[in-house]
């Protein structure tokens, strides 16, 4: 059997973060400004933030903007009688302000937000991020990024053509340190020199991979022959730290220090190990050395400072600002400062310091009783450092100076709380980023409050002379610190959120269930994931698609094929305070068959029909500032008044071809007929008439396959002014072009000083901005100037030959020509008429069938800050979404016409399923697809695609574009506000026509929509009881650890006032409510001291009193943590959820009575019960090295039936029919069966390899079964039971077929089944869902042989032909190292992440790859669509 592994939910955990001042051009050049905001403050990009977790790399802009402060000056009940609300309507006919309205002045506050630029899933696990600048940075002014990966790899990346581009990849996986070193304890550390002269990566066996970076042109001359002179680096090499000093062993941390002429590195290492039982004789084993890399001499590493005798619990180093100097060493019990002369100053934060080290310290902060394991530190002022603990508590660390040295280190009380940190970095001036692997991350504002202190003059004796002060001046002089110390005292620092980056975090457990709101015949399973863990948990309720939440039926539109809710200005319309006049729907057009009905909308639920028009409606929109309606039918174009009456026939009926589609944007209209001819109309606002206008001044109008006229309100659509090389200075086009000119004076020349700057100066930024081509900002006409808040208007045409033309309105001048849209290129810009063919796509051959574009929509998509997108729907059902990104420089050296300053970058692509087979197209489908844009539905702006498989196309500012499917076909869609709700929309589905709304709790930031609930406790397990439809969770509470001896007597440990007591976990069982107020604890059960829940499942056991003889119970396996001096044990519990009978409302506030958790039995065990399950009505539970099957006798006690001795320690038990897979901690898994007469376990087969199994599951497909296991390293293995194979030892050994590296280690797995009928007891096909420690959800589905062979060939083509980010090989990433095999077993599981790259390739490249393997692109896309799983 074969399988496909793909990602359902990418990882959102953040392990590494990095701030880059100038990584993208938007940090140098000003952003486009919306026309409606010309008089407001600019939005400024202060820098870029790069975050990484697992295999996901994301790049953000940090945008600083001013937002109004909303103040409720008057309440509604305080408004005097007769006083009307003043509403600011959009500019229309009467755009002159009468001046009588009283307006309160707006107050603004400055905030910063994260704006996502790009996101990639790489073919490697990211282990570090570092910033650098190369020789090219002196030309374009941009920073570069270095990313390190698992298996000792470094990639140098830069920003080019609107995305990340790979400069080089450096691999060290074949060096001797990686082949023979100890990889188990290897922790890769990536560091770069502050002046970008060196990058190092730690390797096993105390070695460094060194990459010298070139910063001056003169450094290119001494390069060795054969090395590329264009490379921004010198040849890298591997340095053994023993060459520096033989005492350097066991590197704990290292970092480069700022302010040195040569690269200077600080090394923290421990030549000798110690442990807690050896502290009486050996302590203070760590050493700190500061050495210089002398690159000129090659092998010289001078020692500057050496300090020994540092605490043995040292954790990491923090570089100090130049004003403070030195290095901060963080230990688990205190903070140590080491200056450049080797002077040590320390402060302890708990009383364990004196038991661990003999180093003298300040005891002023010992009462804080902090634990610094897992903490993160960063300096925010020259003398103040923020210390963020593992639980998110923020403490300020103040360094007080005594002369020129640090005198006192003071750790202040907790100031605030942030998410549990995995990384902490400074994100510009006055901000830090707190990255978390357990959930949401913060972009936080640093609040610095200083107390005013009056400076007292100190009188000196005339005879008292300080010679140093006489020579160098008073070191306490306020002039040295810009009078800060004179006016202000010590700072009090706290953090507050600027922006929150949502994330799932580590997933502890998952469970499938049915929502209580699902009623009737249609029930959709939901996946509940428990994430978080260290402080509290988050309940994430995932659904595949956005749920249809119905408010009321709309029976008047039962047969509607298309609806238009229009905000027409009518006196009888109902006004709502929270809905702007421009969004208030007053007229409804419903196209039904060969007629169109016109309705007037009021606040009443039932609309009033006021007219009827002949023919179906293709398009309708408000016209002439919402005073009229323009309607397009297949035969005519008419102008209607605000009551739906015809006032002008714009395009009368004729014998010509029918109109097939149209686009309207007041005052422009364009129609396309069946023969692909187009007609353009322009409305006269004064005369209230619409007339035809020619598109081209000479010749015939172009023949087009798609047309669109649209309005841009974001300001992104701008144009470059024409320029000629002979009449103007050469313009540096280094940022966007591939061939960068050799400009030596890019930033004040390439001097050593400018090349080694870490950040651009304002003068350098101004010089780069002056090189920018002129961009059109003025309004092209008087009419657009008057209506500037409405935005600029543009006309887009896709000719029959596949060329996209964008023309500015109203002058109809071409500003963009490109074939990139028709060829599905990854990105495209204006070709400027210089390239006859598109660079990234191949020209179509003669006789080759064309995949035409049948609909093209330019619309904003986003939440809060919207982005302009281009949606293109092809004839085959292919949907491409392009984001319109601003450009700041042109690719060509000269251009004779205006050029659109926009780059269209593909951000999403998919194939919409069409019934009827592969050859069916959208044009002849049963229900064709149509793109319907919408605006502001619960704050979301995007598009909805009606058809056989409807989709929502939405996005948010900090997350990529998402496409969420619906389970039912949709015939019509439209946003409405006539009932007073902002989040309401009309939809006609198979169940009928409804007014629906988006739930306010719905989160659409992730790849799967979900509802999120923040819990007060941390939860480790969750399960669903199908009988009561309730969830049960196991909470983990941190309590002081209590040690017991073998007789059960309490043992006392070390005692002291400031000693931190040891803690452990104690579990409780909690029953959650359902319905309108879900996830409230309504009942529970507390376990004993030191007892933790190890496993929990919903089991179906025999129960004589139940209907059918079976009943659902909750089985819980626990274990006791008694410490290392006493043997552990466990218990098996059986609980049942019962509905209470009696008076309701007996609970406390907020409780939901009616259900309770009842304990049926408790069965003691000699070992922890790590796994429970059920089989044929019996309970399965592990007990250390044994497996038991038990029956529930009279619902009150467990009766043992059979047992099986297994290898070492069972971790998982999975059941299919009467077969079981028992996973072991060290010995892989067994394949076992159970017989009932007599009760007996039978071992069928075993896996003989030593693998630490985390999950083991059955994968079933049409009578065949295979076994899929995953281990702690994230490796997935597929094994078969094949007695006919000679190597299987007559079936006693399971045969290994495939090894596949899945990335992050799985924490839990669930198997779901696809049953063709409800009567099928056992599944003919299964799907495995995995949850990982990095917050990802992945899946494995089976693949038929013919489809697998085809997709395997596609994968081979993609490995060779697709461009992979960072230059990583996807095949090498998925290969598992196994020394027992002569060659890797890499075939058998397809890489879904790699296959998803197929849809992103240009059409020409797709056809070329498919021609080599004898298939077509539509067949491959259909295969991938069919393998999407059944959840």
Swiss-Prot record:
Disordered, as annotated region: 721-759
Entry keyword annotation includes Nucleus: yes
Keywords annotated in UniProt: mRNA processing, Nucleus, RNA-binding
Alphabetized InterPro entries for the sequence: Beta-prop_RSE1/DDB1/CPSF1_1st, Cleavage/polyA-sp_fac_asu_C, RSE1/DDB1/CFT1/CPSF1, WD40/YVTN_repeat-like_dom_sf
Ranges of compositional bias, category Polar residues: 740-759
GO cellular component, one term: mRNA cleavage and polyadenylation specificity factor complex
Gene Ontology biological process terms from the UniProt entry: mRNA processing
Stretches that traverse the bilayer: none
The name this protein goes by in its record: Protein CFT1
Organism for this UniProt entry: Cryptococcus neoformans var. neoformans serotype D (strain JEC21 / ATCC MYA-565) (Filobasidiella neoformans)
